[in-house]
């Protein structure tokens, strides 16, 4: 469902992200005692009474300073307003009206979006009314005293807010496919997001660490709705300092868990690095479908064999993800970017796919016929009784055997390859659970391939 959008606007460090966390009933927006933590516009689902909507956290607005990312942050805030049904202008009740507040309120009065004035940091109900009264001078109507930390006063604010939102009957009902964009810093994740959208939703800069939050953006292609999640670049743990970057990386890992499909973005110039391999490991650990996106392909000198050779190099390093499709794109030019959606659709379908028990056992019967289970040094042979798919997302097949310990890694890889060859499952990992027939104990194994 395409939910109505509410933009959260205000100066740096007035508590916008704290209010977003309060409204969204989570702590996904990064809150840190440092101005400028939020840079891109980030989307969070929220609700009040019987109304669902999205709150959009934006960077702190400063009109009289063009250093660093501030002009780009202004663009993001303006873009958020253009798609919003309403806006909440957050000010600091402890400081009182500032020149920056007056400048933003003058700008907001020229917009065609209804604006509610939230006076934050009013921790005392009695003092809050006095603090809020000072903000009548901004000319934006009634100031609502609130506490983003404790939640006081937000009920009255939200009661008024939902009067500006479209009714649920006016909203299309569609299932969303969650797609997380993951990669090292500066491989082009935000550029890829912007290429999907045809606009600059995420701030793009040659400086590593530009993206801080996991940015949610909803787009539609054909009959499908996709929630694209851009994330902070993930560096080696020893290079990460505690603070905003630490929280950003945690958000990125959570974004992998939220995803139906993960786009693992690799820099075509650098190739597959050790950090890329660790990210691929994380994707498999979480059981997510995945597509390997080789970005900056326009910067590579090519001949008729380049793609084949490069693909082989990628697979040599990411051999345990041989099931994932690889696509070569240029986010800057947009070349082949739209083709990613076709691969996403296939990966999602396979990730959710269920196979009849009869089909599973036909594959097992044929596999055992061609290659019998191994025999131990004591002369005891492994035996597979039957198999059945027990879950999806990722597809998980339980194999009931006489003794899981009698099946070595080579044979387990062989059985997985047979399922891949006979059934498919492109774009998604599969898990095989080897269960003893008597004990029915599940051996904790992801059945990950190892290089032979």
Curated annotation (Swiss-Prot):
Keywords of this entry: GTP-binding, Nucleotide-binding, Repeat, Ribosome biogenesis
Name of the gene encoding the protein in the UniProt record: der
Record function comment: GTPase that plays an essential role in the late steps of ribosome biogenesis.
One GO process term, biological-process aspect: ribosome biogenesis
Binding site for GTP 1: 10-17, 57-61, 120-123
Residues where GTP 2 binds: 183-190, 230-234, 295-298
Boundaries of every KH-like domain copy: 353-438
Keyword Flavoprotein: no
Similarity remark: Belongs to the TRAFAC class TrmE-Era-EngA-EngB-Septin-like GTPase superfamily. EngA (Der) GTPase family.
Quaternary structure and partners: Associates with the 50S ribosomal subunit.
GO molecular function: GTP binding; ribosome binding
InterPro entries from the UniProt entry: G_ENGA (IPR031166), GTP-bd (IPR006073), GTPase_Der (IPR016484), KH_dom-like (IPR032859), KH_dom-like_a/b (IPR015946), P-loop_NTPase (IPR027417), Small_GTP-bd (IPR005225)
Pfam families named in the record: KH_dom-like, MMR_HSR1
Gene3D superfamilies according to UniProt: 3.30.300.20, P-loop containing nucleotide triphosphate hydrolases
Protein name: GTPase Der
Lineage: superkingdom: Bacteria
Native organism: Crocosphaera subtropica (strain ATCC 51142 / BH68) (Cyanothece sp. (strain ATCC 51142))
UniProt domain EngA-type G: residue ranges: 4-169, 177-352
